[in-house]
């Protein structure tokens, strides 16, 4: 009887493993197909996809999802205009990576390391707290007159993927335009990607 239970457990575990893999592969294919249809000239391989309505960041390696992170985008929704405090949409790339080897909780102001460590609050929501912590990666728009140039320039707006001292808000819209992540997550992502990696932001 015991051996039968072990065999049944083995096959259930095996089924769960392949079911999960199949699910991720299906999601990967759907996202890759969607991006390819919108950006047919863009060669896809390693890239970041951010879904604003999902409040999720997907890291793709070789066109397969390798990591999924909860994020927090703008409390005001999606938009590309300067001074809108909205999260921009479209094709971007990571232009700068700042904060390598900085301790968790390091405070950054105007992309400079202040050498101060702030408290990471994972218990309470502070809507007005907008501290940039641990790591930041600035985004540059790649689409002229959509997120690059004039009054819609993402880089001039100072839009980053960054850590936050207000981790309780992760998973719900609460930022002033940037993409916030938990501090351990931003370190992992920072170490996993290179500058110029494509970043696709969609309101879905």
State the predicted function of each range:
Residues 2-4, 14-204:
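N-terminal pre-domains immediately preceding structured catalytic cores
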Residues 6-10:
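Hydrophobic helical h-region of N-terminal Sec-dependent signal peptides
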